[in-house]
Amino acid sequence: MLDLVHKIFDSRNRKIKRKLKDGLEQVNSLETRIRDLSSDELRNKTSEFKERLFKQSASLDEILPEAYACVREASLRTLGMRHFDVQIMGGIVLHWGMISEMHTGEGKTLVATLAAYLNALSEKGVHVVTVNDYLARRDTEWMKQIYRHLGLQVSCITSDMRDPERAHAYKADITYATNNELGFDYLRDNMKFSKGEMVQRDLHYAIVDEVDSILIDEARTPLIISGVTDNASYLYASMNKLAEKLDSTLYIVDEKTRTVSLTEEGQEAIEKLLMAEKFIESGSSLYEPQNLQLVHCLNQSLKAINLFQKNKDYIVQDGQIVLIDEFTGRMMHGRRYSEGLHQALEAKENLKIQNENQTLASITFQNYFRMYGKLSGMTGTAATEREEFSTIYGLEVVQIPSHLPVRRVDHDDEIYASKKEKYEAILALAKECHEKLQPILIGTTSIENSEELSRELKKAKLKHSVLNAKQHAFEAEIIAQAGKPGAITIATNMAGRGTDIQLGGNINFNISANDEAEKEHAKNEEIVRKAGGLYVIGTERHESRRIDNQLRGRSGRQGDPGESKFFLSLDDDLLRVFGTSGIRNMLKKQLSNNGAIKHSYITRSLEKAQKKVESRNYEIRKNLIKFDDVINEQRKVIFSQRNNIMESGDIDLLPIVTEVNAKTLENARSKNFYDISTLIHSMQSIYNEDFKELHKTEDIDGFIDSKTKSIIAEKERAHVEFLLEIKKRIMIAILDQLWKEHLQFLENLRLSINLKAVAQKNPLIEFKHEAFQAFQRLSERWHENIIASFVRVKLVERMHMKVM
């Protein structure tokens, strides 16, 4: 079976390689002819391509060779940079709607210009997605020279922009922006009251840089727009004190699944403590419905204390908990954990506890980016997640060869008995490299570890730079100069991705760049090359091989020399939490005889442990998206209804009246008879009119139909000037409120649904069933509330409504 799969895969690869080779040859064959064009003639090619697209029905595939040749020439004329053949191949893969895996330093920023230009010709907009504002600004400023030379408009969206600026930026042919800004703009647009207030166009085509970081690493973190709910801060403060007192034998901490659960003895002890503190009534059970909020707060407090580390998972800054991205080491300002976990952390750190937030709108990156008509991406490390990209996003990964052979030497891992011995070995290597002026990049997994290692380097009198979440503002500059002779740089995980570490330092960051500076740079580059290039040191294996490969990939760019090595200890999280007992016991025996173990077997064993973790994380993400897809389908319906209302030139309430009346009559029917008292009460509560005449009439259905239509007609005559706008405002406002409540229900449902597995029920099927029923109730309530609000509305002044 596996042989068959490999044959199919190899066959597919051969076909792609053939197509890439053919495409490249076509682009190269046009280079001389395009080079002979004047600047005006080159710019006019854009108009010519559009005419072929719109008037001659040509396809983008047919235009690709000439368009790519034009971009290559424009880049050479404006930036002095000619796209290499491998970059042309990468650009072709992007146009095909695939992921282009290219080694670090291969010029992915330049690759994106090819597919961005070609797809912008369709005049539907192209989004080039980066991981932070700095890269979005940098790439816009850098690449806009190419686009403008070809007559296209380019823009950039950053977090400090207002709506009018955003709307203008989205109208450009090509827009650079972060994944967060794009996602939040989509959510905010779908909370607006008119089309004119919305900023985004339809989602046509996206090129995602560092696609693995955005579509894999951040897939489990939804974008959430929230509002404040009732204050329960006192509960978190109380539960934190209680959790701190609780003996660790009364609960089980599972670091693999990041959960905490009370033992039976723990449940009994908690019940007694809560009764003593008068949080629950004497004789009451911990898991009775009225006590579930207490249980939830306590569980979150136990998680905050046992599973979340200060300076690793978060930092405290200006009296706030600021989350740290576990994959990049960057601070995530404005992000808060949901479900009370953030409040539990605030209680743990004795900070002011903020109110819990209620979700007003949310979406995962998985579902946001799947809305694009075409999606593609670039990264240096996608192959290990090939299956996930294919299964969830329908994206194929194509590995592009490097322009020059990779000369980096990847040494076997070294493993030590303790963290102390590991750091001593790292210091010894750092001194050795520093003496011969070989630059070093040391990757750590947390702020705490980076600062601890920094203290050790200071003791050894080794000058160095530290890049972690606390130095975020200097990220690009620190990383850019990490290739200078003798430089030592400590960086958390993959901070600084997107900025090249050039041997000798990056001259573009030298403000006083001149002939003298260029000579100095050339001299420094030669010194570093002779010393062996950049030496990357990993202080710990990450859960994902991909993150380790990203760190290694900082060295050996574009055929440069370089080295890499990982130093590990038995204290490391990967070995402690995920390593098998067999590996750990074998290592302990070996380490008792030697100072360190260095063998390819160790590297292979650790990679097996990493594969296990990757597989588990993939299953979690795959399972999460199954649940999120249910919510996403409902979100699409709600957002579509909002758009239809905003675009409507006329809204007829009579079909809604008919539906509401039919449902009200059905609810008041008992066997073949109406409960008239119930019916009168229901109709009066909806229509705000007297319906006592129902006692006297025989044609109940006819009377209700006639009277309700008369009420609506009278209200429409009273508000004729602003009638359409009143209807739109009412319908959208009520829909938003009900959707907000529905999201809260779904959040609670998802938290509790796993209990269904205990009763031998499939949690996903149960979730779908209950979510569907709740969505039907939302629709019924929406229609009823529309009518109830419309008949009660009074105009106080122009554009101001008051529901009586």
From Swiss-Prot:
Monomer and homodimer. Part of the essential Sec protein translocation apparatus which comprises SecA, SecYEG and auxiliary proteins SecDF-YajC and YidC. It is an enzyme of class 7 (translocase). Part of the Sec protein translocase complex. Interacts with the SecYEG preprotein conducting channel. Has a central role in coupling the hydrolysis of ATP to the transfer of proteins into and across the cell membrane, serving both as a receptor for the preprotein-SecB complex and as an ATP-driven molecular motor driving the stepwise translocation of polypeptide chains across the membrane. SUPFAM superfamilies: Helical scaffold and wing domains of SecA (SSF81886), P-loop containing nucleoside triphosphate hydrolases (SSF52540), Pre-protein crosslinking domain of SecA (SSF81767). InterPro entries: Helicase_ATP-bd, Helicase_C-like, P-loop_NTPase, SecA, SecA_CS, SecA_DEAD, SecA_motor_DEAD, SecA_preprotein_X-link_dom. It is found in: Cell inner membrane; Cytoplasm. This is Protein translocase subunit SecA. Belongs to the SecA family. It comes from Neorickettsia sennetsu (strain ATCC VR-367 / Miyayama) (Ehrlichia sennetsu).
